[in-house]
Swiss-Prot record:
Its main location: membrane. Residues 343-364 are annotated as: Disordered. InterPro entries: FN3_dom, FN3_sf, Ig-like_fold, Type-II_Cytokine-TF_Rcpt. Belongs to the type II cytokine receptor family. Phosphorylated by GSK3-BETA and MAPK; phosphorylation by GSK3-BETA stabilizes IL22RA1 by preventing its proteasomal degradation. It comes from Mus musculus. PANTHER family: INTERFERON/INTERLEUKIN RECEPTOR, INTERLEUKIN-22 RECEPTOR SUBUNIT ALPHA-1. This is Interleukin-22 receptor subunit alpha-1. The chain crosses the membrane at residues 231-251. Glycans are attached at N80, N172. Residues 18-115, 141-221 form the Fibronectin type-III domain. Disulfide bonds join C71-C79, C128-C217.
């Protein structure tokens, strides 16, 4: 046995000595990376430019050598045997034969080769993505020439099951961060913006103790432009807000209503009291016999002054603007009673109603003759005024074409006050009726005389409506008016009490009365001496004419209980009819 071992050792040494001494071929070996197997060799000192090389290979355990196609009699000094040795679980041998001109061939064989054990791992393919405060690293899979049973290429992760990645990040060679894992995506967080970092990625296989060369990437984090974005956003927002504000202000300016002129500033003018609106009712005549025909003629209305609302006993009487209404004027003389003292004359109310003891010139009343006097009513002095005496006077030469009365009684029912009237005040149980005797001439109206009828002599027609058309919004009131004398129970009574309570300023007589049946309906046929008063419009709520009969004093007393609507309308009112000549 010792002899056999000695012979084999000497023979091998002799063979190697023969190959090495030729100087044509040396350093035959496999170089494998990522399972790509390349056979390489070097020429010896005796090799020339015309030396050619041939390559053969075989699998471990086989006796027959296989020639590599494409690697026969070549002058280059490498041959790719990747496809011939792709089974990474097998062992292979390869040999190279060098032939020089005029010399014997020289052959050299490699050691046993296993790609799984002898292959090296290349650096991984990594992409480094810099961010403002982080760096992201993506590892791409590495493909190998090794084919699976189904024919697709295998990756390193599929061949080396224990493979993992090691990542390092260096900052100025003083600070480093480490990450490891089998995943393919990694990110280093918390970095400084606008700073350069050096990263390295290595593949490790613990079982075979393989380690790839590191992949090095130099990357710089992005600068922090957050403040720029914030500032830009704030500027854009401010500009948008400013544009919106300008548009809104422009819209408000365009749609703003114009400022009214100072001439329409009513509050500046009406400084004494707020503006009040009163309801007016105008009596419109529908027939005037004074004209040449029966058609309605233009009519001028006189000024009618109506006393204010009634006040409770003892209260100071004040006139209100809502109690007065002006409806036209006509050129006639002013009549007044003669028995009223001049110092007790009360001027018509002005725009600033005040209860004053002195007579003030009216600010809106027509001009009055020097001898004109107005009825004075002064309950403040506590005087008892005797009723004025009426004497028949001559017929007026000039009478108004027509007149109408408009009254807005804003007061409410209250206890009758103390009044001084131009009419005789009747005692309780007595009734005095005045009849109006009137004469109508073409284009002229004359008032005749006043006939005073005593008790028992009063006869009334069956139909005696109010001789003066009157409109009001106030319902009937059955209370009576009382004077300061306790024996005087009533102020106005009867259908003609209105005309009998009217005093014409500027003339000492009262309005003449005459018993005459006047119809308030404008549809009555036939002309009448009372055509002027017939033409006045009746109240809107007036019904048919109330039938009256001749009454004795007892009948007159019963009539006191049934007051007409006209009595209730003029209750508590001291009427003064004024014509301006």
């Amino acid at each position: 046995m010792k002899t056999l071992l000695t012979i084999l050792t000497v023979g091998s040494l002799a063979a190697h000595t023969t190959v090495d001494t030729s100087g044509l071929l040396q350093h035959v070996k496999f170089q494998s990376s990522n399972f790509e197997n390349i056979l390489t060799w070097d020429g010896g000192p005796a090799s020339t430019s015309d030396t050619v090389y041939s390559v053969e290979y075989k699998k471990y355990g086989e006796r027959k050598w296989l020639a590599k196609a494409g690697c026969q009699r070549i002058t280059q000094k490498f041959c790719n045997l990747t496809m011939e040795t792709r089974n990474h679980t097998e062992f292979y041998y390869a040999k190279v034969t060098a032939v020089s001109a005029g010399g014997p061939p020289v052959t050299k064989m490699t050691d046993r080769f296993s790609s799984l054990q002898h292959t090296t791992i290349k650096p991984p393919d990594v992409t480094c993505i810099p961010k403002v405060r982080s760096i992201q690293m993506l590892v791409h899979p590495t493909l190998t020439p090794v084919l699976s049973e189904d024919g697709h290429q295998l990756t390193l992760e599929e061949i080396f099951h224990d493979l993992f990645y090691r990542l390092e990040l260096h900052v100025n060679h003083t600070y480093q961060m480490h990450l490891e894992g089998k995943q393919r995506e990694y990110e280093f967080l918390g970095l400084t913006p606008d700073t350069e970092f050096l990263g390295s990625i290595t593949i490790l296989t613990p079982i075979l103790s393989k380690e790839s060369a590191p992949y090095v990437c130099r990357v710089k984090t992005l600068p922090d432009r957050t403040w720029a974005y914030s500032f830009s956003g704030a500027v854009l927002f401010s500009m948008g807000f400013l544009v919106g504000l300008l548009c809104y202000l422009g819209y408000k300016y365009i749609t703003k209503p114009p400022v009214p002129p100072n001439s329409l500033n009513v509050q500046r003018v009406l400084t004494f009291q707020p503006l009040r609106f009163i309801q007016e009712h105008v009596l419109i005549p529908v027939l005037d016999l004074s004209g040449p025909s029966s058609l309605p003629q233009p009519i001028q209305y006189s000024q009618v002054v109506v006393s204010g609302p009634r006040e409770p006993p003892g209260a100071v009487w004040r006139q209100s603007l809502s109690d007065l209404t002006y409806v036209g004027q006509s050129d006639v003389s002013i009549l007044q009673p003669t028995n009223v003292p001049a110092q007790q004359t009360l001027s018509p109310p002005s725009y600033a109603p005040k209860a004053v003891p002195e007579v003030q010139p009216p600010s809106y009343a027509p001009q009055v003759a020097s001898d004109a006097k107005a009825l004075f009513y002064s309950p403040q002095q506590g005087m008892k005024t005797r009723p004025a005496t009426y004497d028949p006077q001559d017929i007026l030469d000039s009478c108004p074409a027509s007149y109408a009365v408009c009254v807005e009684d804003s007061g409410k029912d209250s206890t009758p006050g103390i009044l001084s009237t131009p009419k005789y005040l009747k005692t309780k149980g007595q009734l005095q009726e005045d009849t109006l005797v009137r004469s109508c001439l073409p284009g002229d109206l004359s008032l005749q005389k006043v006939t005073s009828l005593g008790e028992g002599e009063t006869q009334r027609p069956k139909s005696l409506p109010s001789p003066l058309g009157f409109c009001t919004d106030r319902g009937p009131d059955l209370h009576t008016l009382r004077s300061e004398e306790p024996e005087t129970p009533r102020y106005l009574k009867g259908a003609l009490s209105l005309l009998s309570s009217v005093q014409i300023e500027g003339h000492p007589v009262s309005l003449p009365l005459h018993v005459h049946s006047v119809s308030c309906s404008p549809s009555d046929e036939g002309p009448s001496p009372w055509g002027l008063l017939d033409s006045l419009v009746c109240p809107k709520d007036e019904g048919p004419a109330v039938e009256t009969e001749a009454m004795c004093p007892s009948a007159a007393a019963s009539e006191l209980e049934q007051s007409t609507e006209l009595d209730s309308l003029f209750k508590g009112l001291a009427l003064t009819v004024q014509w301006e000549s």
